[in-house]
């Protein structure tokens, strides 16, 4: 299963709210758009489930949390999924996958949403930055970036080699 230009182009639009879409498009056009979103999201879901099945069992990651293609009021401007092992379901840190109009990202993140219900502080999470230099010695840094999440997901991220 491969991501195609159409998967990225799905998000290349100005309007994501159903209220605004209804002002500019017919019901039939909106229904067609919803159907297209659902088709791409089903592919996204299948991709994430396939990734999970391909992971080593000792990681304990059996089911990703896959965000829906809509929240009821808006189409998503990206598709997103979080991965946590069974032992880490109650922790804020997770691996995540993001697909938007610009890129496909795999990243470690601190999930702020409902963070008060899970364990792990921002301070403890940020301590992981201290391990980046040693880890970077084991990989080719090309293609790795730092995303502080304070910047928008579409802003170019800082290359890891520049950060180090």
Language-model features and meaning:
Residues 62-95, 99:
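Amphipathic, interaction-prone secondary-structure segments
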Residues 5, 26-30, 37, 117-121, ...:
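Short, structured coil/loop segments at alpha-helix boundaries
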Residues 49-67, 97, 130-152:
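Short, charge-rich amphipathic segments
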Residues 41-44, 69, 73, 80, ...:
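A residue-identity detector for tryptophan
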Residues 2-12:
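N-terminal targeting/trafficking signals and adjacent low-complexity tails
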Residues 11-62:
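Active-site acidic/histidine clusters and adjacent loop/turn architecture
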Residues 102-163:
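Compact, glycine/acidic-enriched structural inserts
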């Amino acid at each position: 299963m491969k991501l195609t230009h159409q998967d990225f182009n799905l998000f290349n639009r100005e309007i994501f709210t159903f209220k605004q879409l209804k002002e500019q498009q017919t019901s039939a056009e909106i229904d067609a758009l919803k159907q297209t979103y659902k088709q791409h999201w089903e592919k996204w879901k299948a991709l994430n489930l396939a990734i999970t099945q391909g992971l080593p069992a000792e990681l304990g990651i059996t089911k990703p949390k896959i965000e829906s293609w809509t929240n009821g009021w808006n189409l998503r401007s990206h598709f997103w999924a979080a991965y946590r092992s069974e032992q880490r379901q109650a922790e804020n840190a997770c691996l995540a996958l993001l697909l938007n109009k610009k890129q496909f990202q795999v990243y470690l993140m601190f999930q702020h949403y409902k963070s008060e219900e899970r364990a792990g502080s921002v301070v403890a999470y940020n301590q992981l930055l201290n391990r980046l230099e040693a880890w970077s010695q084991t990989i080719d840094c090309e293609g790795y970036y730092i995303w502080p999440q304070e910047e928008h997901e579409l802003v170019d991220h800082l290359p890891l080699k520049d950060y180090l």
